């Protein structure tokens, strides 16, 4: 079920998005190759992901101008993955690779929504979500980061960010500890002072359609 048509723009909304399964599968293969220091294999998987992304865009976005803009945005993160593989394969953290895949997923949804006339902005969760020294979410600093971030953002009804990714006190990419989708989404919503979270499960980018299904909505007390 493609849910993008059901995403409304009459109220301000923050979409907390999982990495699409097709992309996550590719990211896992890249990470496995890097773990074994098989750089050539890792780069082949990066190229395979790039080819798939271009194919999906050709299927999804009919406007040539919009498609070219989407390709440009996504290729930036493909190149960053390739650079990580080439420059420091023994030092690269697979969470940095995961972060690139998550951003690419957000960009896919962003450009598809724009094609439907729904203006939006992609926010990198690592730019505002922080863990404290106790490895628990630092809500005070996260809220401050959001306030600063929003000052320079366009006034749009939809914001898209990534699920579970954040930064620790050492400015390293990491994952929010514990919890599940309800918790992660509610945490992000709390940072934005939202009153309700609508949860979606995300599938893949298959046959030119983003697969998402709305499961339920929850208040922060329920989460």
Residue positions per predicted region:
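Nucleotide/pyrophosphate-binding catalytic subdomain
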Residues: 1-223
């Amino acid at each position: 079920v493609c849910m993008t048509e059901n995403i409304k723009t009459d109220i301000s909304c923050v979409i907390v998005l999982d990495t699409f399964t097709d992309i996550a599968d590719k990211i896992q293969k890249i990470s496995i190759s890097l773990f074994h220091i098989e750089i050539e294999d890792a780069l082949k998987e990066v190229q395979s992901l790039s080819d798939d992304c271009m194919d999906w865009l050709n299927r999804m976005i009919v406007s040539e101008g919009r498609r070219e803009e989407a390709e440009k945005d996504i290729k930036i993160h493909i190149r960053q993955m390739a650079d990580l593989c080439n420059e420091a394969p023994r030092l690269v953290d697979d969470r940095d690779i995961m972060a690139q895949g998550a951003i690419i997923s957000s960009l896919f949804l962003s450009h598809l929504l724009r094609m439907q006339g729904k203006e939006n902005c992609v926010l990198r969760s690592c730019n505002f979500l922080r863990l404290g020294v106790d490895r628990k979410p630092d809500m005070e600093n996260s809220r401050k980061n959001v306030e600063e971030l929003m000052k320079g953002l366009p006034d749009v009804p939809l914001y898209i960010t990534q699920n579970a990714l954040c930064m620790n006190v050492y400015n390293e990419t990491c994952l929010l500890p514990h919890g599940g989708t309800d918790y992660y989404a509610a945490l992000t919503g709390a940072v934005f002072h939202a009153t309700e979270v609508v949860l979606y499960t995300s599938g893949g980018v298959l046959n030119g359609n983003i697969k998402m299904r709305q499961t339920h909505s929850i208040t922060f007390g329920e989460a």
